[in-house]
C-alpha cells in the first residue's frame, strides 16, 4: 500500500474516486454522476458513469465499486483509507451503474471521503495478489514503467472518458532519494 505523499501524487493520476473537489473545495461528480442522500443522512445512493473503462479495457460497474470498498475495509489489506469509511455499515450494487452506501450514523464528510475510494478491478487484484507493482485504474494516465529509485512513467489513457484529457501523452516522475536535494 502506498502511504508516502510522493506516491499519492503518482497514484492520483492512475486511480479516481467517485467524487472530486473543485477549486472552491466543493464536491463534484467524478466516477459518480449524481447522488441522493436520505433525509436521515444514513443512505447514499450514487449513480455511476456508464462510459468508464479500466486500463485493461473492461467496463467499470457498481460491483467494482463495492469490491474496492470491501477491499479497503478488509483488515488484511491494511489500507490507510479504511478510517475514512469506518462509519459505513454496508455497500451494495443496486444496479449495473448504481451503488448504495449505508452509514451507522450521519457523517457529513462521507461524500467528500468518496474522493479517496479508488476503484479497482477484482480480477487484477486476484491475479496479482496486490497492487504494489501493477496498477490498473480508470484515471487519465496508465502505469507504463517503473525503474526503482529512478523514475515512474505514466502514459495517457486513450479510453479516458473526459474529452480532451489528458492534455499530454506522458508524465514522468523522477525519484530524488536524497531529501536535501529535493528542494
Label every model-predicted segment.
Residues 33-78, 94, 100:
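Aromatic- and charge-enriched surface segment that lines or borders ligand/interaction sites
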Residues 1, 33, 43-46, 65-68, ...:
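Short, well-ordered beta-strand elements
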Residues 19, 33-36, 89-92, 142-144, ...:
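Conserved positions in beta-strands of structured domains
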Amino acid at each position: 500500500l502506498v502511504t508516502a505523499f510522493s506516491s499519492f501524487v503518482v497514484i492520483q493520476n492512475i486511480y479516481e474516486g467517485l467524487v472530486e473537489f473543485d477549486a472552491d473545495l466543493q464536491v463534484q461528480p467524478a466516477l459518480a454522476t449524481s447522488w441522493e442522500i436520505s433525509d436521515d443522512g444514513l443512505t447514499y445512493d450514487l449513480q455511476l458513469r456508464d462510459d468508464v473503462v479500466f486500463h485493461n479495457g473492461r467496463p467499470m460497474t457498481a460491483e467494482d465499486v463495492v469490491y474496492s470498498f470491501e477491499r479497503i475495509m478488509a483488515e488484511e489489506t491494511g489500507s490507510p483509507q479504511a478510517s475514512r469509511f469506518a462509519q459505513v455499515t454496508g455497500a451494495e450494487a443496486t444496479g449495473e451503474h448504481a451503488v448504495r452506501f449505508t452509514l451507522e450514523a450521519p457523517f457529513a464528510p462521507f461524500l467528500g471521503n468518496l474522493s479517496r475510494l479508488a476503484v479497482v478491478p477484482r480480477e487484477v487484484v486476484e491475479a496479482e495478489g496486490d497492487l504494489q507493482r501493477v496498477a490498473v485504474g480508470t484515471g487519465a494516465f496508465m502505469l507504463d514503467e517503473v525503474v526503482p529509485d529512478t523514475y515512474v512513467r505514466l502514459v495517457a489513457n486513450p479510453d479516458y472518458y473526459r474529452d480532451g484529457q489528458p492534455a499530454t501523452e506522458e508524465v514522468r516522475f523522477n525519484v530524488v532519494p536524497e531529501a536535501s536535494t529535493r528542494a
